């Protein structure tokens, strides 16, 4: 007997299917389901009178043969596709993406459900990989709470707390600080990795930081990013298979952007805030987007360009870089970094895939909880101002969505050598997953999973008779408590440090994971974000020309994903 359902009725019961479209929050962005792994009439759903019951959708298989958790009928949005599927999680990892059910009585089942299987209802929800923020100033540990609640599950950067050096630079300097920060990482339900200070002209001060556990090194102009320091730092990185991140020389004291590029010598490097408002050769650091060995990212205060962007940056910059507004030279330094023309061009370079990643610059000219929001606000602004991208059309923005989601998931993972563990929703990877109601997509996740266990969720009054009564707000769940914390989150270190046994020497509880393949990455590896234009910046007008085209756009006067969703 066959029952025909309308698309609306089907979507309300099992979530959208192939050809259905979903609006992302209150933006103008629409995604369309490209494939449905489930089978019509054989869908599984949990609840009273539903399918996942003993002898029906639940089989008799033992724990070894079934997942620990399934997310049913979810819409997956990832760099590789936009699909509807059931997601299986086993031993903290994504085990399969496919069709769940009871293979004894149902056709086409690729994921067997058993008595050992927990169910998370994904009907009508969007699932993305946990975000990766690669520009963290570890100024206050409370940043981690904000980041996790926003959908970020991995934080990479440097610092030691609210020290003056950390307020300005993302460096955890020296073996002693590195050991202490790695020990502190055991207390937080998020994946962490730390960058050492890369500013030295001889290798040993850098090698000892890698040996102590640094996943890479950070070159910052406030410590002196000279060509000699750049060359030495990259040489150490090549020898240790670690990444280098750089904040270049805003004042052009030791050379211009061409001098910095020459010091790279074709070696891989991650350029932070590549537009320059966050720091870097004024006014033309954007030129490095055309280099094959440069992996460029933005920080979120300039994302997207709005009528308020310029006004907030001056005071923000003065505080972050320990400048004095009463000193003319300090004021000139600050003003040289804030250029409306290059900020406007930054929007377009993101939309065209020339800027590959987006990060926060947390508490140091950036907002740790707004990486994901500002990524999608930029995508919306570009859709409104520039129309559909090639490959998209009137029906959907699938390619644009894949391009933008890659900026804070897979591309940062590839850049920093952790893509074998995190950064996408693929079998074998750590199950760091974020569930969103479409109306709140990118803004307020419903639930965040770490290593296959619920870490943070929107939860109502714990004394209520059901989970939903007010006040509903983000609360930490069982993955953040006791021994579960150390078994659901990762600490990334260098291979050198892992081989030297720092986990035992430091007494670390979390699983440590060595970074790898950091030195053979090129711009071509930046998924959906590999464009290498030839860029010039007029030194007087700051006009940005990319492959002969003037890049300019108007500032936004209103944005989605903003006051509609927040009381304050």
From Swiss-Prot:
- Segments forming domain Urease: 130-568
Known cofactor(s) = Ni cation
Tell me yes or no: is Cytoplasm among this UniProt entry's keywords: yes
Give me the comment on cofactor binding.
Binds 2 nickel ions per subunit.
GO MF term (any one): nickel cation binding
Q: Kindly give the InterPro entries that the UniProt entry links to this protein.
A: Amidohydro-rel, Metal-dep_hydrolase_composite, Metal_Hydrolase, Urease_alpha_N_dom, Urease_alpha_subunit, Urease_AS, Urease_asu, Urease_asu_c
**Keyword set for this entry?**
Cytoplasm, Hydrolase, Metal-binding, Nickel
Q: Where would you find this protein in the cell?
A: Cytoplasm
Pfam families for this protein: Amidohydro_1, Urease_alpha
Give the record's PTM text: Carboxylation allows a single lysine to coordinate two nickel ions.
Tell me yes or no: is Hydrolase among this UniProt entry's keywords.
yes
EC numbers: 3.5.1.5
Positions binding Ni(2+) 2 in this chain are 218, 247, 273
Q: Which residues carry this modification: N6-carboxylysine?
A: 218
- Quick one: which pathway? Nitrogen metabolism; urea degradation; CO(2) and NH(3) from urea (urease route): step 1/1
Q: Which residues form the active site?
A: 321
Show which residues constitute the signal peptide. Answer: none
Tell me which residues bind Ni(2+) 1: 135, 137, 218, 361
GO CC term (a single one): cytoplasm
Q: Which reaction does it catalyse?
A: urea + 2 H2O + H(+) = hydrogencarbonate + 2 NH4(+)
Q: Its quaternary structure?
A: Heterotrimer of UreA (gamma), UreB (beta) and UreC (alpha) subunits. Three heterotrimers associate to form the active enzyme.
Q: Which family does it belong to?
A: Belongs to the metallo-dependent hydrolases superfamily. Urease alpha subunit family.
Q: What is this protein called?
A: Urease subunit alpha
Q: Origin organism of this chain?
A: Burkholderia ambifaria (strain MC40-6)
């Amino acid at each position: 007997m066959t029952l025909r359902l309308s698309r609306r009725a089907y979507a309300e019961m099992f979530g959208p299917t192939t050809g259905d479209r979903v609006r992302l929050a209150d933006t103008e962005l629409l995604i369309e389901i490209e494939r449905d792994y489930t089978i019509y009439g054989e869908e599984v759903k949990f609840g009273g009178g539903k399918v996942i019951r003993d002898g029906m959708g639940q089989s008799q298989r033992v724990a070894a043969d079934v997942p620990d958790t399934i997310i049913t009928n979810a819409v997956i949005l990832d760099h590789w596709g936009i699909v509807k599927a059931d997601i299986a999680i086993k031993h903290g990892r994504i085990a399969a993406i496919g069709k769940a059910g009871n293979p004894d009585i149902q056709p086409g089942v690729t994921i067997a459900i058993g008595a050992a299987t927990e169910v998370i209802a994904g009907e009508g929800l969007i699932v993305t990989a946990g975000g990766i923020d690669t520009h963290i100033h570890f100024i206050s540990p409370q940043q981690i709470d904000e980041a996790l609640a926003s959908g970020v599950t991995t934080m990479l950067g440097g610092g030691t707390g609210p020290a003056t050096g950390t307020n300005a630079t993302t460096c955890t300097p020296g073996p002693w600080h590195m050991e202490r920060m790695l020990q502190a990482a055991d207390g937080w339900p998020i994946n962490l990795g730390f960058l050492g200070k890369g500013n030295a002209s001889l290798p040993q001060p850098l090698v000892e930081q890698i040996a102590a556990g640094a996943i890479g090194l950070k070159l910052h102009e406030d410590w002196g990013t000279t060509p000699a320091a750049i060359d030495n730092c990259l040489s150490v990185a090549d020898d240790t298979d670690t990444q280098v991140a750089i904040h270049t020389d805003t004042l052009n004291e030791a050379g211009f952007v061409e001098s910095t590029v020459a010091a790279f010598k074709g070696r891989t490097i991650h350029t932070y805030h590549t537009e320059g408002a966050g720091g870097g050769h004024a006014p033309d650091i954007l030129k490095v987007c055309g280099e094959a060995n440069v992996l460029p990212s933005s920080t979120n205060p300039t994302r997207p360009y709005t009528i308020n962007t310029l006004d907030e940056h001056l005071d923000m910059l003065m505080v972050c870089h320990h400048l004095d507004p009463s000193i003319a030279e300090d004021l000139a330094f600050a003003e040289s970094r804030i250029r409306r023309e290059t900020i406007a061009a930054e929007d377009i370079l993101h939309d065209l895939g020339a800027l590959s990643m987006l990060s926060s610059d947390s508490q140091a000219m950036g907002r740790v909880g707004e990486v994901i929001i500002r990524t999608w606000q930029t995508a919306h602004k570009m859709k409104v101002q520039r129309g559909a991208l090639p490959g998209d059309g009137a029906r959907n923005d699938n390619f644009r969505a894949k391009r933008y989601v890659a900026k804070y998931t897979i591309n940062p993972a590839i850049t920093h050598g952790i893509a074998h563990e995190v950064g996408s929703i693929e079998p074998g990877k750590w199950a760091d997953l974020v569930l969103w109601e479409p109306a709140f997509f990118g803004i307020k996740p419903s639930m965040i999973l770490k290593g296959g266990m619920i870490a943070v969720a929107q939860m109502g009054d714990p004394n209520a008779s059901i989970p939903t009564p007010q006040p509903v707000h983000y609360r930490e769940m069982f993955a953040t408590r006791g021994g579960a914390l150390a078994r659901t989150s990762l600490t990334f270190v260098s291979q050198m440090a892992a081989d030297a046994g720092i986990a035992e020497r430091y007494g670390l509880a979390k699983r440590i994971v060595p970074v790898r393949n950091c030195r053979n990455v090129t711009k071509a590896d930046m998924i959906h974000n590999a464009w290498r234009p030839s860029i010039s910046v007029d030194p007087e007008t700051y006009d940005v020309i990319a492959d002969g085209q003037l890049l300019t756009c108007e500032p936004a006067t209103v944005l989605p994903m903003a006051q509609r969703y927040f009381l304050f």
